[in-house]
A protein has these predicted regions:
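Glycine-rich flexible loops
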Residues: 1-261
Length: 261
């Protein structure tokens, strides 16, 4: 819930888009919210899904149609533990023109040396532009390959991370990089980071200290705006409540009542 709200508050997500993370104790499942605007997500909105994107327990709840994006990427990339799909207005011009999005300042190096493109037309012809079929999700995951970001022609972008905080960091700063690249192109020819600079700078930015500093900044901004999810005030997700309930049930079953004296 917090990651959704941070990315929305920083102007990347709007009423649409979604963020997920691989289940912390079961790599064969992932956690994703029900179909709701990211800035409104609460812990109780989070549900578990199999890697085939089937809900584990979400009867009567409207779900994201594009959840196959997440499941297919988790299947293809065991190293990935968090995924974000968005339609950032700063990134969309690159998705529309086909101009390469490259790191143009040091913080933008977290997107990699360049983001590859995926075009649904290449395999599926004219569609409704939504990635809702398993074969579409698999095709997108293939285009992502070993990269950290893939641009979806005429649609948006999908990013991944090895942790949720890394994903948030990469999502926010690739959005900023796109805005800076757009502005720079208006002035003239851009001078992006070299491959060597990007390969050295990206991992440096993703060290614990820089990420902790950024996370503190984002959460403080969110708190000051009064938009912190209930988890910031002690709330629990449905997945956490379910695990707690199962644990309580097991305890009640296995613990024998004491005899009265």
């Amino acid at each position: 819930a917090l990651a959704n709200r941070i990315i929305a508050h920083e102007g990347v997500l709007d009423g649409f888009g979604h963020v997920s993370m691989r289940h912390p104790t079961d790599p064969g499942r992932y956690l994703l919210a029900r179909s709701r605007s990211p800035e409104l997500i609460e812990p109780a909105d989070i549900f578990e899904f199999t890697l085939d994107s089937e809900p584990v327990a979400a009867k009567g709840v409207t779900l994201y149609g594009e959840r196959v994006i997440h499941g297919c990427i988790y299947q293809a990339r065991p190293d990935v533990n968090a995924v974000c799909h968005h339609h950032s207005p700063s990134v969309l011009p690159f998705c529309i023109t086909g101009i390469e999005l490259v790191p143009v300042f040091h913080m933008g190096a977290v997107l990699g040396t360049a983001a590859p493109f995926w075009d649904s037309r290449d395999e599926f012809g004219d569609t409704n532009m939504l990635v809702v079929k398993p074969e579409e999700g698999q095709s997108l995951a293939k285009a992502l390959g070993a990269h950290w970001m893939v641009l979806m022609r005429r649609h948006g972008a999908t990013l991944v991370g090895t942790t949720l905080r890394e994903l948030v960091f990469r999502t926010v700063y690739s959005h900023a990089n796109a805005e800076i690249q757009l502005r720079s192109m208006l002035l003239g020819k851009i001078g992006p980071l070299s491959r060597g600079e990007a390969e050295r700078t990206g991992p440096h930015q993703l060290q614990p200290r820089p990420m902790a500093r950024a996370w503190e900044y984002w959460t403080t901004r969110l708190e000051k705006s009064g938009e912190m999810p209930k988890s910031g005030r002690g709330g629990k997700s449905r997945a956490a409540k379910s695990r707690a309930g199962n644990k309580t049930a097991r305890t009640r079953t296995t613990t024998r009542p004491r005899a009265k004296r």
